[in-house]
């Protein structure tokens, strides 16, 4: 592969779409805490002065959706009308129904292992050895930039920052290996009274330099910090936000394919979410085992059917054993039936709100990031 550029972006927890994702997952977590078998599909819409929470939820739990919503917005940092949104005064509307009994009869089974998929669909998982967390570097560092923005905003280092922010990083590759960073974009909402030159210097020193490895930066690296020159109006006042609108930010930054299904607000019976997590787990273990440098897994399902309709392994010519053998190993060591993968990854816990900002993959404490099958795979493949 010749020289090329690759770009990924991320958005902060205060971005309108991410506010919506976090509210949806906060509702999911609150329900799972009381009722692990709940069926939840929770969608959120945010706009100036209002939040609408809707969807289909079947549960024995009772949760205070208004309180969950306000607490989530408050934790993000929207606590004053000067920011364009206020957790204490925004309207919170709820339009929740129950999951269709037609879906229930396809999912629920006497034998849990025969639990059917909650919908048809295709999901992808990916891993690459170009970073220590086995994730693509562009999206990894895009996430770290907006995470750092939130950190210096919340700890008072840069108190004039506001919650809404976006990042974008363009990496240079040569022969498939990273050789540098070509461009960095960081746009951050800020207080009215801050001078742009002060903002520019502070963002450079407190956000960009501490995050991006110096060996990848050079005199030709381009920096675009608030390139419009002003970003006072942000959050839900600047744009409306919806759950599920940042599916590439949530996954691999465009470096792997995507089946189209969003994650936030969905309980683990929805294979859009749980099977995408399982596919990441499979791909990461294959790469961690040294069986390939890059690995993409596709898995697909039919509604109401437990067994996947297909499993595909793609290794982009980096495999150390035949891909047919890799596929057999996946079938042998990973149970990708809906209930099997829920058990395998221990998914019936309130762990989802944290996933809803800064990416669902690449943070080691999530169960789908474990590499506990790597040695088993390596041994079974006959590699020393």
Curated annotation (Swiss-Prot):
Location of the region described as Flexible loop in the Swiss-Prot/TrEMBL record: 99-109
One GO MF term: methionine adenosyltransferase activity
EC number: 2.5.1.6
Pathway involvement of the protein, from the record: Amino-acid biosynthesis; S-adenosyl-L-methionine biosynthesis; S-adenosyl-L-methionine from L-methionine: step 1/1
Binding site for K(+): 43
Coiled coil ranges: none
Residues reported to bind Mg(2+): 17
Cellular component per GO, a single term: cytoplasm
Catalytic activity annotation: L-methionine + ATP + H2O = S-adenosyl-L-methionine + phosphate + diphosphate
Essential cofactor(s): Mg(2+); K(+)
GO BP, sorted A to Z: one-carbon metabolic process; S-adenosylmethionine biosynthetic process
NCBIfam families: metK
Protein family: Belongs to the AdoMet synthase family.
Subunit structure: Homotetramer; dimer of dimers.
Protein name (record): S-adenosylmethionine synthase
